[in-house]
């Protein structure tokens, strides 16, 4: 199975950016999907924007995929949204779940972030059946808040939300934009039988990356950030490969697909 993970960078401030507005980047994302041909796609930051197409319209240009999109606060404009898309010729979606990173995770709710900018954060999961093997596995997509206390509480709640859905021996891929590389994340998941798969994260020309968030280019064309925020974890996953589907020089000098790098996961 091949999974592509990407925060598509639809923050509300991007709508009028001369370089990073959605109209400049949407086709770059489609080109990336067509080049990599993943079986499953995980998108974060699929927010609605006032002055451009919704992600539901965008997904019409990926006709080979069925998809699930969930909003943190349905009907509220600034809701955060996640997508899990999949190739229906290879996979059957058995079930789907959405939970909230909050004190009431079973119902639409805001979390522990800044009250003026908290529109809820969710985890979206799907169980799939491979048509050619009858093997089942779970895929979970997450996007944490940027607030430090919200991140901490989300980390501690995360294993419980997953374990309530999955059997102890279920094969699981957990990926997304965690907005942190804090040791608490890695230790908490390790203590709950998750392996950190994305420690071996290279470009296509085998340059090791310790960064997944590169920010926007400045007026001189230089990338402005170097944080490691996007991670992949697995349970009962033993044969896998993780990479960024671009060469290092392209990332440094030309990449504008998003402020995050895409991560590709291949697993058996």
Swiss-Prot record:
GO MF terms held by the record: 3'-5'-RNA exonuclease activity
Membrane-spanning segments: none
Coiled-coil segments: none
Gene3D superfamilies referenced in this protein's UniProt entry, alphabetically: Endonuclease/exonuclease/phosphatase
Top-level taxon: Viruses
Name of this protein: Uncharacterized protein L388
Species the sequence originates in: Acanthamoeba polyphaga mimivirus
Lineage of source species: Viruses, Varidnaviria, Bamfordvirae, Nucleocytoviricota, Megaviricetes
């Amino acid at each position: 199975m091949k999974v592509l993970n990407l925060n598509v960078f639809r923050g509300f401030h991007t709508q009028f950016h001369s370089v990073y507005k959605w109209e400049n980047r949407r086709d770059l994302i489609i080109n990336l999907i067509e080049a990599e041909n993943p079986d499953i796609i995980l998108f974060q930051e699929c927010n609605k924007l006032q002055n451009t197409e919704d992600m539901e319209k965008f997904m019409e240009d990926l006709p080979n995929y069925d998809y699930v999109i969930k909003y943190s606060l349905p009907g509220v404009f600034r809701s955060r949204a996640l997508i899990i898309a999949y190739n229906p010729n290879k996979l059957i979606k058995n079930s789907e779940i959405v939970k909230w990173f909050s004190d009431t995770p079973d119902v639409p709710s805001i979390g522990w972030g800044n009250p003026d900018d908290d529109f809820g954060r969710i985890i979206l999961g799907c169980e799939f059946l491979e048509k050619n093997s009858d093997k089942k596995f779970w895929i979970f997509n997450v996007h944490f808040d940027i607030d430090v206390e919200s991140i901490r509480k989300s980390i501690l709640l995360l294993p419980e939300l997953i374990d309530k859905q999955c059997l102890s021996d279920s094969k699981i891929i957990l990926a997304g934009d965690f907005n942190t590389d804090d040791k608490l994340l890695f230790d908490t998941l390790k203590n709950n039988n998750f392996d950190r798969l994305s420690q071996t994260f290279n470009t296509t020309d085998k340059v090791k990356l310790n960064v997944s968030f590169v920010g926007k280019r400045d007026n001189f064309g230089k990338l402005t950030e170097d944080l490691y925020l996007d991670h992949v974890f697995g349970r009962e996953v033993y044969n896998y490969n993780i990479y960024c589907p671009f060469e290092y020089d392209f990332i440094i000098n030309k990449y504008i697909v998003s402020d995050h790098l895409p991560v590709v996961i291949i697993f058996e």
